[in-house]
């Protein structure tokens, strides 16, 4: 993500120390760093401090994220940070927006979002040729229900398996698992961790993996590629700071996506994919929704309209689902 210098340096409202809550993974810390960099551009004199939390999702590595009834998708990676906000221990919680449930807890709000990174999923494979060249029955790892359902729809022959852990852990497991052909990860997370994907390969611990973007094949998760800055609704001094680093175009897009998520009564484990494009004042939203019955085909829907009415566009998409 490229940070654009603000038009003017801002004097922050009176806040002694701006405490930033984050998970402790390398990706979460990188996203906290992007937040700190954006704040430093807007408020050079603002003092920030990190507070790291371990969430239930970080602890319970035995939970299957492909089984929503077992994982309990709502707040699996966010609740501990939200509780800290409600206790007033931190000023802001930094989240991968795709991890957030459709509803904020009472008293909390997504006050700002940083500029969105690329939203595509990528295939990380051991052999060249990409998605179409995967052999019949190839084993593919993912922890996402959305990715798993889209993969099975596109390639019913593939064997999709549970694949948990942080990015580095998953790459090490892939290198060591001769029987697994590849895994799926978000392009945004890989780039934020400093991986160079421009050559179509990924170098990690002396292993070269082949990379293929699945943009156009798989629709991303709601909020994928966006960093959400969540704060208390009753802290106007905090809101005033965060609003200065809010990225308007990203915020419009995620308002449409999260409204659709709310209408579907969904959490981050729901098998729904979305793609939102914003051109000027025109917003287009496309979605794919999978039934609990895996024998049924997915339903696709789309709508477009004024960027000033993201909720209306989401409602039009929702109305096309049975």
Q: Positions of the model-derived regions?
A:
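Small-molecule-sensing regulatory modules
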Residues: 6, 13-61, 67-70, 78, ...
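A conserved helix-loop-strand patch within extracytoplasmic ligand-binding domains
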Residues: 97-100, 106-157
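Short, well-structured alpha-helical segments in soluble
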Residues: 76-88, 176
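Extracytoplasmic loops/domains of multi-pass membrane proteins
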Residues: 83-86, 95, 100-103
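Short, well-ordered beta-strand segments
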Residues: 19-21, 93, 111, 141, ...
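Short, Asp-centered acidic motifs that coordinate Mg2+ and/or phosphate
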Residues: 90-94, 181-182
């Amino acid at each position: 993500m490229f940070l654009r210098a603000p038009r003017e340096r801002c004097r922050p409202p009176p806040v002694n120390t701006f405490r930033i809550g984050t998970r402790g993974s390398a990706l979460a810390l990188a996203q906290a760093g992007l937040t700190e960099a954006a704040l430093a551009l807007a408020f050079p004199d603002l003092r920030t401090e990190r507070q790291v939390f371990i969430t239930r999702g970080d602890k319970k590595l035995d939970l299957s994220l492909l089984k929503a009834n077992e994982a309990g998708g709502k707040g699996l990676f966010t609740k501990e940070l939200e509780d800290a906000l409600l206790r007033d221990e931190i000023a802001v919680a930094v989240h991968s927006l795709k991890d957030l449930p459709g509803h904020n807890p009472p008293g909390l709000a997504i006050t700002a979002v940083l500029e969105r990174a690329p939203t595509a999923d990528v295939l990380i494979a051991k052999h060249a040729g990409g998605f179409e060249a995967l052999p019949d029955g190839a084993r593919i790892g993912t922890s996402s229900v959305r990715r798993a359902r889209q993969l099975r729809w596109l390639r019913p022959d593939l064997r999709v398996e549970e694949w948990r852990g942080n990015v580095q852990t998953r790459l090490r497991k892939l290198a060591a698992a001769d029987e697994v052909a590849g895994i799926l990860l978000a392009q945004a997370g890989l780039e934020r961790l400093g991986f160079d994907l421009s050559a179509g390969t990924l170098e990690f611990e002396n292993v070269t993996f082949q990379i293929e973007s699945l943009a156009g094949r798989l629709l991303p998760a709601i909020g994928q590629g966006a960093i959400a800055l969540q704060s208390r609704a009753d802290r106007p001094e905090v809101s005033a700071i965060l609003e200065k680093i809010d990225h308007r175009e990203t915020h419009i897009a995620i308002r449409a996506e999260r409204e659709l998520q709310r209408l579907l009564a969904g959490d981050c484990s729901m098998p729904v994919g979305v793609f939102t494009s914003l051109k000027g004042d025109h917003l287009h939203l496309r979605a794919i929704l999978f039934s609990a019955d895996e024998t049924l085909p997915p339903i696709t829907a789309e709508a477009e309209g004024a960027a000033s009415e993201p909720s209306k566009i989401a409602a039009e998409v929702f109305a096309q689902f049975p």
